[in-house]
Amino acid sequence: MAASELIDTFGRRISYLRLSVTDRCDLRCTYCMPERMQFLPRAEVLTLEELRDLAVGFMRRGITKIRLTGGEPLVRRDVVDLIRALGRHVGDGLEELTLTTNGTQLAGHAQAIADAGVKRINISLDTLDRATFQRLSRRDALASVLGGIAAAKAAGLKIKINTVAMKGVNGHEIPALIEWAHGEGHDVTLIETMPLGEVDEDRTDQFLPLVAVRESLEARWTLTDSDHRTGGPSRYVEVAETGGRLGFITPLTNNFCAGCNRVRVTATGQLYPCLGGGERVDLRAALRSDDPDSNLSTALDTAMKIKPERHDFRIGEGEEPALARHMSMTGG
């Protein structure tokens, strides 16, 4: 074991960084943020150079996969410059550089992203129905998202569709969305609603356990458990009838903490060792200190000591959100 590796107190090796480049987004998805979301002052957000230096510091400590997130990462001005800078490390310590996007800005960036060394991306899409999309995101942007997906496919990017399953919202159209995605050659991952941040709607009413979703899909299709792993929380099945792969992320009904290999850093440089925990370490202060390399490494050691064994997500009538911060702040 290399001395520089990031190992937490439960023996888990941290190899995956989810790095938020902005808390801003051009959608207002009801399960993610309120309509009148108060975004961070720009002065508090790390510069692109600081984000690059931060990522390089993590690579020195054994991080081999970096995912750029938001908010919506592609609304950050000149973010493709950051992608290019990090892409130069792919194959030289960094095994994979990827990002998660809502797809609205993707048509104009897909080729540049692919040229920078990104091989696959995740795209958030909860519905193929224009009215439902507008209700969920509070924006009429489905056509832009579908155009972005088409552009990414044309650029040669491998695409995974992330879909939050919501009772009474999109649960009934999940089979059609899977059929469409698999027909286009895209994997799909279904995600349970997570109790993060104050929003304008009741998550209890929307919560749809994926155990129930899987049972309904098994009545329609032949699902075979897959050995496919991406180092993340998703558990995959192969769908015989569609010829595609389907993942399930179940933080509420079946937590995925034992094999956790990741940390998250916000656009302000706050490291959260756990998506569902309040523990954090300030990396921005280390970056802006007189000895950034040494202080950043020390801060990462501190983060390993406070990473909890598991999250404490709960959802139910009268339950407060597990944490007040929004997913757009943490980096989804």
Swiss-Prot record:
Binding site for S-adenosyl-L-methionine: Y31, G71, S124, M194
Pathway note: Cofactor biosynthesis; molybdopterin biosynthesis
UniProt: [4Fe-4S] cluster 1 binding residues: C25, C29, C32
Keyword annotations of the record: 4Fe-4S, GTP-binding, Iron, Iron-sulfur, Lyase, Metal-binding, Molybdenum cofactor biosynthesis, Nucleotide-binding, S-adenosyl-L-methionine
InterPro entries in UniProt: Aldolase_TIM (IPR013785), Elp3/MiaA/NifB-like_rSAM (IPR006638), MoaA (IPR013483), MoaA_NifB_PqqE_Fe-S-bd_CS (IPR000385), MoaA_twitch (IPR010505), MoCo_biosynth_MoaA/MoaC (IPR050105), rSAM (IPR007197)
Source organism superkingdom: Bacteria
Binding locations of GTP: R18, R67, T100, K160, R262, V263, R264
The protein's Enzyme Commission number: 4.1.99.22
Every Radical SAM core domain range: 9-234
GO annotation terms (biological process): Mo-molybdopterin cofactor biosynthetic process
Cofactor note (record): Binds 2 [4Fe-4S] clusters. Binds 1 [4Fe-4S] cluster coordinated with 3 cysteines and an exchangeable S-adenosyl-L-methionine and 1 [4Fe-4S] cluster coordinated with 3 cysteines and the GTP-derived substrate.
Cofactor(s) in the UniProt record: [4Fe-4S] cluster
Binding residues for [4Fe-4S] cluster 2: C257, C260, C274
Reaction catalysis annotation: GTP + AH2 + S-adenosyl-L-methionine = (8S)-3',8-cyclo-7,8-dihydroguanosine 5'-triphosphate + 5'-deoxyadenosine + L-methionine + A + H(+)
Cross-referenced CDD domains: Radical_SAM, Twitch_MoaA
Function: Catalyzes the cyclization of GTP to (8S)-3',8-cyclo-7,8-dihydroguanosine 5'-triphosphate.
NCBIfam families, A to Z: moaA
Oligomeric form and interacting partners: Monomer and homodimer.
Name of protein: GTP 3',8-cyclase
Species assigned in the record: Erythrobacter litoralis (strain HTCC2594)
Gene: moaA
